[in-house]
Protein backbone atom coordinates (compact mmCIF):
# COMPACT_ATOMS: atom_id res chain seq x y z
CA UNK A 1 0.00 0.00 0.00
CA UNK A 2 2.82 2.40 0.86
CA UNK A 3 4.37 1.74 -2.52
CA UNK A 4 1.15 2.68 -4.32
CA UNK A 5 0.95 5.89 -2.32
CA UNK A 6 4.54 6.65 -3.38
CA UNK A 7 3.58 6.57 -7.05
CA UNK A 8 0.31 8.43 -6.56
CA UNK A 9 2.10 11.08 -4.53
CA UNK A 10 4.53 11.81 -7.34
CA UNK A 11 1.70 11.80 -9.86
CA UNK A 12 -0.40 14.24 -7.85
CA UNK A 13 2.53 16.62 -7.41
CA UNK A 14 3.28 16.59 -11.11
CA UNK A 15 -0.31 16.89 -12.34
CA UNK A 16 -1.80 19.16 -9.70
CA UNK A 17 1.05 21.68 -9.71
CA UNK A 18 1.99 22.37 -13.34
CA UNK A 19 5.30 24.12 -13.92
CA UNK A 20 5.20 27.79 -13.04
CA UNK A 21 1.79 27.64 -11.30
CA UNK A 22 3.04 27.29 -7.74
CA UNK A 23 2.65 30.48 -5.79
CA UNK A 24 1.77 29.43 -2.24
CA UNK A 25 4.65 26.96 -2.13
CA UNK A 26 7.18 29.62 -3.14
CA UNK A 27 10.21 27.47 -4.06
CA UNK A 28 11.79 30.53 -5.64
CA UNK A 29 11.59 33.52 -3.37
CA UNK A 30 10.77 34.13 0.27
CA UNK A 31 11.28 30.60 1.49
CA UNK A 32 10.14 31.52 4.98
CA UNK A 33 13.68 32.07 6.36
CA UNK A 34 16.91 30.25 7.08
CA UNK A 35 15.72 29.38 10.59
CA UNK A 36 12.49 27.77 9.41
CA UNK A 37 11.65 24.54 11.21
CA UNK A 38 9.51 22.28 8.96
CA UNK A 39 6.40 20.64 10.31
CA UNK A 40 7.14 17.55 12.38
CA UNK A 41 10.75 18.46 13.22
CA UNK A 42 10.98 19.62 16.86
CA UNK A 43 13.39 22.37 17.86
CA UNK A 44 15.42 19.86 19.89
CA UNK A 45 16.05 17.59 16.89
CA UNK A 46 19.47 17.24 15.29
CA UNK A 47 20.64 20.12 13.05
CA UNK A 48 18.49 20.40 9.95
CA UNK A 49 21.61 20.58 7.77
CA UNK A 50 24.87 18.87 8.73
CA UNK A 51 28.20 18.62 6.91
CA UNK A 52 29.84 15.27 7.51
CA UNK A 53 33.34 14.69 6.16
CA UNK A 54 33.94 11.00 5.52
CA UNK A 55 37.39 9.93 6.65
CA UNK A 56 36.85 6.16 6.53
CA UNK A 57 35.83 3.82 3.72
CA UNK A 58 33.71 1.91 6.22
CA UNK A 59 30.06 3.00 5.67
CA UNK A 60 29.34 2.21 9.32
CA UNK A 61 31.70 5.00 10.38
CA UNK A 62 29.80 8.27 10.69
CA UNK A 63 32.75 10.51 9.91
CA UNK A 64 33.35 13.95 11.37
CA UNK A 65 30.78 16.75 11.46
CA UNK A 66 32.06 20.17 10.43
CA UNK A 67 30.79 23.27 12.17
CA UNK A 68 30.75 26.62 10.41
CA UNK A 69 33.17 28.96 12.15
CA UNK A 70 35.04 26.24 14.08
CA UNK A 71 38.51 26.22 12.53
CA UNK A 72 39.90 23.88 15.17
CA UNK A 73 37.28 21.25 14.35
CA UNK A 74 38.10 21.68 10.67
CA UNK A 75 41.70 20.79 11.45
CA UNK A 76 40.75 17.89 13.73
CA UNK A 77 38.53 16.42 11.00
CA UNK A 78 41.52 16.32 8.67
CA UNK A 79 40.17 18.75 6.08
CA UNK A 80 42.75 19.24 3.30
CA UNK A 81 42.61 22.86 2.11
CA UNK A 82 44.55 22.29 -1.11
CA UNK A 83 42.79 19.11 -2.26
CA UNK A 84 39.63 18.61 -4.27
CA UNK A 85 36.45 18.87 -2.22
CA UNK A 86 33.28 16.95 -3.05
CA UNK A 87 29.90 17.77 -1.53
CA UNK A 88 27.39 14.92 -1.97
CA UNK A 89 23.80 16.11 -1.64
CA UNK A 90 20.96 13.59 -1.36
CA UNK A 91 17.37 14.15 -2.42
CA UNK A 92 13.86 13.62 -1.09
CA UNK A 93 13.50 10.63 1.24
CA UNK A 94 10.56 8.55 2.42
CA UNK A 95 12.54 6.59 5.00
CA UNK A 96 14.44 9.43 6.65
CA UNK A 97 17.66 7.45 6.27
CA UNK A 98 20.55 7.41 3.82
CA UNK A 99 20.14 5.00 0.94
CA UNK A 100 22.80 2.52 -0.13
CA UNK A 101 23.80 4.52 -3.22
CA UNK A 102 25.31 7.25 -1.05
CA UNK A 103 27.82 4.91 0.59
CA UNK A 104 28.79 3.51 -2.83
CA UNK A 105 29.38 7.01 -4.19
CA UNK A 106 31.44 8.03 -1.14
CA UNK A 107 33.59 4.90 -1.45
CA UNK A 108 34.10 5.38 -5.20
CA UNK A 109 35.21 9.00 -4.75
CA UNK A 110 37.60 8.02 -1.97
CA UNK A 111 39.18 5.34 -4.13
CA UNK A 112 39.49 7.60 -7.18
CA UNK A 113 40.68 10.76 -5.39
CA UNK A 114 42.56 9.51 -2.34
CA UNK A 115 43.53 12.96 -0.98
CA UNK A 116 40.16 14.61 -1.58
CA UNK A 117 37.68 15.84 1.00
CA UNK A 118 34.37 13.97 0.65
CA UNK A 119 31.60 15.80 2.50
CA UNK A 120 28.04 14.47 2.81
CA UNK A 121 25.43 17.21 3.11
CA UNK A 122 22.90 15.68 5.50
CA UNK A 123 19.57 17.47 5.22
CA UNK A 124 17.42 14.44 6.09
CA UNK A 125 15.17 16.33 8.57
CA UNK A 126 14.21 18.75 5.79
CA UNK A 127 14.03 16.10 3.06
CA UNK A 128 11.88 13.65 5.05
CA UNK A 129 8.75 15.71 4.44
CA UNK A 130 5.90 15.89 1.97
CA UNK A 131 7.45 16.34 -1.44
CA UNK A 132 6.13 19.89 -1.77
CA UNK A 133 7.66 20.85 1.58
CA UNK A 134 10.97 19.22 0.67
CA UNK A 135 11.00 21.26 -2.55
CA UNK A 136 10.52 24.43 -0.52
CA UNK A 137 13.42 23.42 1.70
CA UNK A 138 15.92 23.07 -1.16
CA UNK A 139 16.59 26.79 -1.22
CA UNK A 140 17.46 27.08 2.45
CA UNK A 141 19.71 24.02 2.25
CA UNK A 142 21.45 25.58 -0.74
CA UNK A 143 21.99 28.72 1.34
CA UNK A 144 23.57 26.65 4.11
CA UNK A 145 25.93 24.95 1.64
CA UNK A 146 26.86 28.36 0.20
CA UNK A 147 27.49 29.65 3.73
CA UNK A 148 29.87 26.77 4.43
CA UNK A 149 31.72 27.44 1.17
CA UNK A 150 31.97 31.17 1.90
CA UNK A 151 33.50 30.39 5.30
CA UNK A 152 35.97 27.92 3.78
CA UNK A 153 36.99 30.60 1.27
CA UNK A 154 38.26 32.68 4.16
CA UNK A 155 41.01 30.09 4.56
CA UNK A 156 44.10 31.06 2.64
CA UNK A 157 44.65 27.91 0.56
CA UNK A 158 41.03 26.96 -0.17
CA UNK A 159 39.79 27.43 -3.75
CA UNK A 160 36.22 27.29 -5.05
CA UNK A 161 37.65 25.99 -8.31
CA UNK A 162 38.45 22.71 -6.52
CA UNK A 163 34.86 22.28 -5.32
CA UNK A 164 32.59 19.73 -7.01
CA UNK A 165 28.96 19.58 -5.87
CA UNK A 166 27.21 16.30 -6.71
CA UNK A 167 23.44 16.37 -6.22
CA UNK A 168 20.91 13.58 -6.75
CA UNK A 169 17.24 14.33 -7.51
CA UNK A 170 16.24 17.29 -5.28
CA UNK A 171 19.88 17.47 -4.23
CA UNK A 172 20.78 18.64 -7.73
CA UNK A 173 18.65 21.75 -7.27
CA UNK A 174 20.13 22.25 -3.79
CA UNK A 175 23.52 22.32 -5.53
CA UNK A 176 22.12 24.85 -7.99
CA UNK A 177 20.97 27.15 -5.19
CA UNK A 178 24.37 26.78 -3.49
CA UNK A 179 26.16 27.74 -6.69
CA UNK A 180 23.83 30.70 -7.08
CA UNK A 181 24.26 32.02 -3.52
CA UNK A 182 27.99 31.44 -2.99
CA UNK A 183 30.42 34.35 -3.30
CA UNK A 184 32.35 33.35 -6.39
CA UNK A 185 32.02 30.48 -8.85
CA UNK A 186 32.04 26.80 -7.93
CA UNK A 187 34.28 24.66 -10.13
CA UNK A 188 31.71 22.02 -11.05
CA UNK A 189 28.20 20.80 -10.34
CA UNK A 190 26.97 17.37 -11.41
CA UNK A 191 23.21 16.85 -11.42
CA UNK A 192 22.20 13.20 -11.13
CA UNK A 193 18.68 13.01 -12.57
CA UNK A 194 17.53 16.33 -11.09
CA UNK A 195 13.96 16.22 -9.83
CA UNK A 196 11.30 17.24 -12.35
CA UNK A 197 8.01 17.97 -10.52
CA UNK A 198 7.82 21.66 -9.55
CA UNK A 199 11.08 22.42 -11.41
CA UNK A 200 10.21 21.69 -15.03
CA UNK A 201 10.07 24.90 -17.05
CA UNK A 202 10.64 27.31 -14.15
CA UNK A 203 13.03 30.26 -14.07
CA UNK A 204 16.77 29.50 -13.91
CA UNK A 205 16.99 31.03 -10.42
CA UNK A 206 14.59 28.36 -9.13
CA UNK A 207 16.43 25.27 -10.39
CA UNK A 208 19.83 23.98 -11.44
CA UNK A 209 21.19 25.95 -14.39
CA UNK A 210 24.48 26.47 -16.29
CA UNK A 211 25.06 29.74 -14.41
CA UNK A 212 25.52 27.91 -11.10
CA UNK A 213 29.09 26.69 -11.71
CA UNK A 214 31.97 26.94 -14.12
CA UNK A 215 30.93 23.53 -15.46
CA UNK A 216 27.51 21.92 -15.00
CA UNK A 217 26.96 18.40 -16.32
CA UNK A 218 23.70 16.49 -15.93
CA UNK A 219 22.59 12.87 -16.30
CA UNK A 220 18.88 12.34 -17.10
CA UNK A 221 17.62 8.78 -16.56
CA UNK A 222 13.92 8.96 -15.61
CA UNK A 223 12.08 11.47 -17.78
CA UNK A 224 9.12 9.78 -19.44
CA UNK A 225 8.47 6.33 -17.93
CA UNK A 226 4.77 5.44 -17.58
CA UNK A 227 3.84 8.99 -18.58
CA UNK A 228 5.39 10.32 -15.37
CA UNK A 229 8.59 12.35 -15.31
CA UNK A 230 10.27 12.07 -11.92
CA UNK A 231 13.48 13.46 -13.38
CA UNK A 232 13.54 16.80 -15.17
CA UNK A 233 13.24 16.58 -18.97
CA UNK A 234 14.57 19.96 -20.01
CA UNK A 235 18.32 20.59 -20.35
CA UNK A 236 19.66 22.41 -17.30
CA UNK A 237 23.46 22.21 -17.68
CA UNK A 238 26.29 22.92 -20.08
CA UNK A 239 25.98 19.30 -21.18
CA UNK A 240 22.86 17.22 -20.57
CA UNK A 241 23.30 13.50 -21.15
CA UNK A 242 20.30 11.22 -21.73
CA UNK A 243 21.36 7.55 -21.39
CA UNK A 244 19.03 5.32 -23.42
CA UNK A 245 17.00 8.39 -24.35
CA UNK A 246 16.56 9.36 -20.70
CA UNK A 247 13.54 7.16 -20.15
CA UNK A 248 13.52 3.34 -20.09
CA UNK A 249 16.77 2.05 -18.62
CA UNK A 250 17.95 -1.54 -19.24
CA UNK A 251 17.15 -3.71 -16.24
CA UNK A 252 14.22 -1.48 -15.24
CA UNK A 253 11.75 -2.73 -17.85
CA UNK A 254 8.28 -4.25 -17.82
CA UNK A 255 9.43 -7.66 -16.58
CA UNK A 256 10.97 -5.97 -13.56
CA UNK A 257 7.68 -4.15 -12.97
CA UNK A 258 5.76 -7.43 -12.81
CA UNK A 259 8.24 -8.85 -10.32
CA UNK A 260 8.09 -5.74 -8.19
CA UNK A 261 4.30 -5.87 -8.00
CA UNK A 262 4.44 -9.54 -7.05
CA UNK A 263 6.80 -8.91 -4.15
CA UNK A 264 5.33 -5.58 -3.08
CA UNK A 265 8.46 -3.55 -3.82
CA UNK A 266 7.15 -1.19 -6.48
CA UNK A 267 9.15 1.63 -4.89
CA UNK A 268 12.33 -0.26 -5.77
CA UNK A 269 11.19 -0.45 -9.39
CA UNK A 270 10.36 3.26 -9.47
CA UNK A 271 13.74 4.32 -8.15
CA UNK A 272 15.58 1.89 -10.46
CA UNK A 273 15.56 4.33 -13.37
CA UNK A 274 15.79 7.46 -11.23
CA UNK A 275 18.77 6.13 -9.30
CA UNK A 276 20.48 4.80 -12.43
CA UNK A 277 22.11 8.21 -12.83
CA UNK A 278 24.01 7.67 -9.57
CA UNK A 279 25.24 4.24 -10.62
CA UNK A 280 26.38 5.56 -13.99
CA UNK A 281 28.43 8.18 -12.16
CA UNK A 282 29.88 5.58 -9.78
CA UNK A 283 30.71 3.40 -12.79
CA UNK A 284 32.70 6.26 -14.31
CA UNK A 285 34.76 6.43 -11.12
CA UNK A 286 35.53 2.74 -10.61
CA UNK A 287 35.75 1.48 -14.20
CA UNK A 288 38.26 3.91 -15.65
CA UNK A 289 39.31 1.38 -18.28
CA UNK A 290 35.76 1.23 -19.66
CA UNK A 291 34.60 4.83 -20.09
CA UNK A 292 31.19 5.44 -21.63
CA UNK A 293 30.84 7.99 -24.43
CA UNK A 294 27.83 10.16 -25.26
CA UNK A 295 27.15 11.84 -28.59
CA UNK A 296 25.61 15.22 -29.29
CA UNK A 297 22.22 15.05 -31.00
CA UNK A 298 19.16 17.27 -31.31
CA UNK A 299 16.79 14.59 -30.03
CA UNK A 300 16.47 10.93 -29.10
CA UNK A 301 14.77 9.97 -32.37
CA UNK A 302 17.70 11.11 -34.49
CA UNK A 303 20.11 9.31 -32.19
CA UNK A 304 18.13 6.06 -32.51
CA UNK A 305 18.41 6.43 -36.28
CA UNK A 306 22.19 6.39 -35.97
CA UNK A 307 22.67 9.89 -37.33
CA UNK A 308 24.62 11.31 -34.37
CA UNK A 309 27.86 9.39 -33.85
CA UNK A 310 30.32 12.16 -34.68
CA UNK A 311 33.14 13.36 -32.42
CA UNK A 312 34.03 16.34 -34.61
CA UNK A 313 33.97 19.77 -32.96
CA UNK A 314 33.39 18.40 -29.44
CA UNK A 315 30.28 16.47 -30.46
CA UNK A 316 31.10 13.57 -28.12
CA UNK A 317 32.13 13.41 -24.49
CA UNK A 318 32.78 11.08 -21.58
CA UNK A 319 29.93 10.72 -19.13
CA UNK A 320 30.00 10.96 -15.35
CA UNK A 321 33.14 11.97 -13.50
CA UNK A 322 35.24 11.92 -16.67
CA UNK A 323 33.09 14.44 -18.56
CA UNK A 324 35.09 17.26 -20.12
CA UNK A 325 34.15 20.92 -20.03
CA UNK A 326 32.91 22.10 -23.41
CA UNK A 327 34.47 25.14 -25.06
CA UNK A 328 31.18 26.58 -26.23
CA UNK A 329 28.76 28.21 -23.83
CA UNK A 330 25.45 26.93 -25.18
CA UNK A 331 23.84 23.73 -23.95
CA UNK A 332 24.59 20.38 -25.58
CA UNK A 333 22.13 17.48 -25.43
CA UNK A 334 23.93 14.15 -25.68
CA UNK A 335 22.81 10.52 -25.92
CA UNK A 336 24.19 7.02 -25.53
CA UNK A 337 23.17 3.41 -25.00
CA UNK A 338 24.19 1.41 -21.92
CA UNK A 339 24.12 -2.09 -20.48
CA UNK A 340 21.82 -3.11 -17.62
CA UNK A 341 24.63 -3.15 -15.05
CA UNK A 342 28.24 -2.24 -14.34
CA UNK A 343 30.29 -1.74 -16.34
CA UNK A 344 27.64 0.15 -18.33
CA UNK A 345 29.83 0.75 -21.38
CA UNK A 346 28.63 -0.43 -24.80
CA UNK A 347 30.10 -0.02 -28.28
CA UNK A 348 28.05 2.04 -30.74
CA UNK A 349 27.98 1.47 -34.49
CA UNK A 350 26.38 3.51 -37.24
CA UNK A 351 25.27 1.47 -40.26
CA UNK A 352 24.62 3.18 -43.59
CA UNK A 353 22.81 0.70 -45.80
CA UNK A 354 22.21 1.27 -49.53
CA UNK A 355 18.82 -0.24 -50.44
CA UNK A 356 17.57 -0.56 -54.01
CA UNK A 357 14.60 -1.97 -55.93
CA UNK A 358 12.40 -2.84 -53.03
CA UNK A 359 9.76 -4.56 -55.17
CA UNK A 360 6.11 -4.75 -54.18
CA UNK A 361 6.81 -3.20 -50.81
CA UNK A 362 3.49 -1.54 -50.07
CA UNK A 363 3.64 -0.23 -46.50
CA UNK A 364 5.44 -3.28 -45.17
CA UNK A 365 8.69 -2.70 -43.34
CA UNK A 366 11.27 -5.51 -43.23
CA UNK A 367 12.49 -7.02 -39.97
CA UNK A 368 16.25 -6.98 -40.42
CA UNK A 369 19.08 -8.23 -38.22
CA UNK A 370 22.82 -7.73 -38.51
CA UNK A 371 25.58 -9.91 -37.06
CA UNK A 372 29.04 -8.37 -36.76
CA UNK A 373 32.16 -10.53 -36.82
CA UNK A 374 35.30 -9.00 -35.30
CA UNK A 375 38.88 -9.88 -34.50
CA UNK A 376 38.09 -10.12 -30.77
CA UNK A 377 34.51 -11.42 -30.71
CA UNK A 378 31.28 -11.77 -32.67
CA UNK A 379 28.02 -10.02 -31.88
CA UNK A 380 24.60 -11.51 -31.41
CA UNK A 381 21.88 -10.93 -34.00
CA UNK A 382 21.33 -7.19 -33.63
CA UNK A 383 17.97 -5.76 -34.73
CA UNK A 384 18.00 -2.84 -37.15
CA UNK A 385 15.40 -0.57 -35.56
CA UNK A 386 13.30 1.25 -38.15
CA UNK A 387 12.49 4.51 -36.37
CA UNK A 388 10.49 6.03 -39.22
CA UNK A 389 10.38 4.04 -42.47
CA UNK A 390 12.68 2.49 -45.02
CA UNK A 391 13.64 4.87 -47.84
CA UNK A 392 13.83 3.01 -51.13
CA UNK A 393 16.63 3.54 -53.65
CA UNK A 394 18.48 5.52 -51.00
CA UNK A 395 20.84 5.18 -48.06
CA UNK A 396 19.23 4.29 -44.73
CA UNK A 397 21.00 4.84 -41.41
CA UNK A 398 20.71 2.58 -38.36
CA UNK A 399 22.19 2.42 -34.87
CA UNK A 400 23.33 -0.84 -33.29
CA UNK A 401 25.45 -1.48 -30.22
CA UNK A 402 27.28 -4.38 -28.62
CA UNK A 403 28.21 -5.12 -25.02
CA UNK A 404 31.60 -6.52 -26.03
CA UNK A 405 34.53 -4.94 -27.81
CA UNK A 406 34.52 -6.80 -31.12
CA UNK A 407 37.89 -5.42 -32.21
CA UNK A 408 38.41 -4.80 -35.93
CA UNK A 409 35.31 -5.73 -37.93
CA UNK A 410 36.00 -8.46 -40.49
CA UNK A 411 32.65 -9.32 -42.01
CA UNK A 412 28.92 -9.16 -41.34
CA UNK A 413 25.73 -11.05 -42.02
CA UNK A 414 22.39 -9.40 -42.80
CA UNK A 415 19.25 -11.45 -42.12
CA UNK A 416 15.67 -10.71 -43.14
CA UNK A 417 13.41 -12.44 -40.66
CA UNK A 418 10.92 -14.80 -42.30
CA UNK A 419 7.19 -14.40 -41.78
CA UNK A 420 7.00 -17.63 -39.80
CA UNK A 421 9.05 -16.07 -36.99
CA UNK A 422 6.78 -13.14 -36.26
CA UNK A 423 2.98 -12.75 -36.00
CA UNK A 424 3.46 -9.06 -36.79
CA UNK A 425 5.28 -9.93 -40.01
CA UNK A 426 2.66 -12.53 -40.86
CA UNK A 427 -0.10 -9.92 -40.61
CA UNK A 428 1.89 -7.44 -42.70
CA UNK A 429 2.59 -10.13 -45.27
CA UNK A 430 -1.13 -10.97 -45.51
CA UNK A 431 -2.09 -7.29 -45.78
CA UNK A 432 0.54 -6.77 -48.46
CA UNK A 433 -0.79 -9.74 -50.44
CA UNK A 434 -4.35 -8.34 -50.29
CA UNK A 435 -3.18 -4.99 -51.65
CA UNK A 436 -0.97 -6.42 -54.41
CA UNK A 437 -1.82 -10.13 -54.90
CA UNK A 438 -0.41 -10.34 -58.42
CA UNK A 439 3.23 -10.24 -57.26
CA UNK A 440 3.60 -11.35 -53.65
CA UNK A 441 7.37 -11.84 -53.86
CA UNK A 442 9.55 -9.21 -52.23
CA UNK A 443 13.21 -8.48 -52.75
CA UNK A 444 15.64 -5.96 -51.39
CA UNK A 445 18.94 -5.22 -53.16
CA UNK A 446 21.81 -4.18 -50.91
CA UNK A 447 25.17 -3.57 -52.53
CA UNK A 448 27.20 -2.24 -49.66
CA UNK A 449 27.10 -1.20 -46.01
CA UNK A 450 29.31 1.36 -44.33
CA UNK A 451 29.99 0.92 -40.61
CA UNK A 452 31.27 3.67 -38.35
CA UNK A 453 32.40 3.00 -34.79
CA UNK A 454 31.30 5.65 -32.33
CA UNK A 455 34.11 4.87 -29.90
CA UNK A 456 37.01 4.86 -32.39
CA UNK A 457 35.42 6.92 -35.21
CA UNK A 458 36.77 4.40 -37.74
CA UNK A 459 34.77 3.85 -40.93
CA UNK A 460 34.81 0.60 -42.88
CA UNK A 461 32.88 -0.36 -46.01
CA UNK A 462 31.49 -3.84 -46.61
CA UNK A 463 30.26 -5.23 -49.95
CA UNK A 464 28.60 -8.43 -51.05
CA UNK A 465 31.23 -10.91 -52.15
CA UNK A 466 29.48 -11.49 -55.47
CA UNK A 467 28.03 -8.23 -56.94
CA UNK A 468 25.52 -10.28 -58.94
CA UNK A 469 24.09 -11.77 -55.74
CA UNK A 470 22.98 -8.79 -53.70
CA UNK A 471 19.27 -9.51 -53.27
CA UNK A 472 17.58 -10.61 -50.08
CA UNK A 473 14.02 -11.75 -49.32
CA UNK A 474 12.18 -12.75 -46.13
CA UNK A 475 13.88 -15.77 -44.54
CA UNK A 476 17.19 -15.17 -46.35
CA UNK A 477 20.59 -13.76 -45.43
CA UNK A 478 23.40 -11.85 -47.14
CA UNK A 479 27.11 -11.89 -46.29
CA UNK A 480 29.29 -8.79 -46.58
CA UNK A 481 33.09 -8.48 -46.56
CA UNK A 482 35.48 -5.52 -46.35
CA UNK A 483 35.86 -3.59 -49.57
CA UNK A 484 36.73 -0.18 -50.99
CA UNK A 485 33.75 0.06 -53.28
CA UNK A 486 31.95 3.39 -53.24
CA UNK A 487 33.28 4.77 -49.96
CA UNK A 488 36.84 5.47 -49.07
CA UNK A 489 37.96 3.46 -46.07
CA UNK A 490 39.06 5.60 -43.13
CA UNK A 491 41.04 4.31 -40.18
CA UNK A 492 41.67 7.57 -38.38
CA UNK A 493 40.69 7.66 -34.74
CA UNK A 494 39.12 10.63 -33.04
CA UNK A 495 41.51 12.74 -30.97
CA UNK A 496 38.73 12.83 -28.37
CA UNK A 497 39.11 9.11 -27.68
CA UNK A 498 42.60 9.76 -26.32
CA UNK A 499 41.05 11.78 -23.50
CA UNK A 500 39.57 8.67 -21.90
UniProtKB/Swiss-Prot annotation:
Compartment(s): Secreted
Catalytic center residues: 169 (nucleophile), 193 (charge relay system), 274 (charge relay system)
One GO CC term, this protein: Golgi apparatus
Residues carrying a glycan: 65, 80, 136, 359, 393, 491
Domain called PLAT: residue spans: 347-482
Enzyme class: hydrolase
Pfam families for the chain: Lipase, PLAT
Keyword flag Lipid metabolism: yes
MF terms (GO), sorted A to Z: heparin binding; lipoprotein lipase activity; phospholipase A1 activity; phospholipase activity; triacylglycerol lipase activity
EC numbers for this chain: 3.1.1.3, 3.1.1.32
Keyword hit for Signal: yes
Signal peptide segment: 1-20
Residues reported to bind heparin: 325-337
Catalysis: reaction(s): a triacylglycerol + H2O = a diacylglycerol + a fatty acid + H(+); a 1,2-diacyl-sn-glycero-3-phosphocholine + H2O = a 2-acyl-sn-glycero-3-phosphocholine + a fatty acid + H(+); 1,2,3-tri-(9Z-octadecenoyl)-glycerol + H2O = di-(9Z)-octadecenoylglycerol + (9Z)-octadecenoate + H(+); 1,2,3-tributanoylglycerol + H2O = dibutanoylglycerol + butanoate + H(+)
CDD domains registered for this protein in UniProt: Pancreat_lipase_like, PLAT_LPL
Keywords for this protein: Disulfide bond, Glycoprotein, Heparin-binding, Hydrolase, Lipid degradation, Lipid metabolism, Secreted, Signal
Tissue expression from the record: Expressed in placenta, lung, liver, testis and spleen.
Gene3D superfamilies, alphabetized: alpha/beta hydrolase (3.40.50.1820), PLAT/LH2 domain (2.60.60.20)
Disulfide bond residue pairs: 64-77, 252-272, 297-316, 308-311, 463-483
A GO BP entry: positive regulation of cholesterol transport
Recorded family membership: Belongs to the AB hydrolase superfamily. Lipase family.
Name of protein: Endothelial lipase
Source organism: Mus musculus
Amino acid sequence: MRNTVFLLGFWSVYCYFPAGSITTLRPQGSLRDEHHKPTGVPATARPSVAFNIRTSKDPEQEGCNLSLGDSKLLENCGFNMTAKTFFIIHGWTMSGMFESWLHKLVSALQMREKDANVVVVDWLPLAHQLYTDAVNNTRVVGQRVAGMLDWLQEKEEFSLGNVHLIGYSLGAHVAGYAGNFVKGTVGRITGLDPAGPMFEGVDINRRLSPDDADFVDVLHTYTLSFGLSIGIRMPVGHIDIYPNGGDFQPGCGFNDVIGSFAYGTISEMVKCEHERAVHLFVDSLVNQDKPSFAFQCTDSSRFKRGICLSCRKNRCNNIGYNAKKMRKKRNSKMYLKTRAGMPFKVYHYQLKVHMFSYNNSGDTQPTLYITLYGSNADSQNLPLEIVEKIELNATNTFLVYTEEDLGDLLKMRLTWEGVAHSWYNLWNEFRNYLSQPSNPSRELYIRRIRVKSGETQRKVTFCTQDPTKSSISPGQELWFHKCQDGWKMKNKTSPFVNLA
